[in-house]
């Protein structure tokens, strides 16, 4: 192994998160040697017991290379992704993982909305929107799974926990949060779907969407849910 590869490998395993991400990008550009180090890193760290940004970034970086041998290896070794798709109600989160792994954020957003309604029950699935009282009863495990998938596959840019952090930083004022995450500009709400940004150039917390036109109570119930303290978000 060359000195440069050795140094980057050490940086990947031992450095700060920021330096890890720099090392991942560099290793991905260094052909089989660098990519082999990334694959080994995945093998040692998956399945994740808790979300780790560097592991998500390695997986997504390798997928984004779109190299047949690597893609085949990832599909064989991680058929359901890198994070346990756990649900307290037996809900299948594999379609969400697949959409996020493919960086198809618009489809992932639609799936998330469907899964949240499924979590709330038949009434919500039929009407296709949520009551805040239904959100309060969501199992923490399911919200943790959904949020972890968004966070891991977006390099930490997307997820309800990201929105919540920005909401807290805004003094819990939704009028300050909406423009910060790109859901409103001045007095004008962002139009769905074309007004939203369905890639990683979007503002932090831009996705997944909530129907804020129905008011803030669903969002507030979600951001106040015990899942965030329970799982250390």
From Swiss-Prot:
MF terms in GO: tetrapyrrole binding
Cited SUPFAM superfamilies: ARM repeat (SSF48371), GUN4-like (SSF140869)
Pfam families referenced in this protein's UniProt entry, alphabetically: GUN4, GUN4_N
Superkingdom of source: Bacteria
Transmembrane domains' residue ranges: none
Coiled-coil features, chain-numbered ranges: none
Family: Belongs to the ycf53 family.
Descriptive protein name: Ycf53-like protein
Species lineage: Bacteria, Bacillati, Cyanobacteriota, Cyanophyceae, Synechococcales
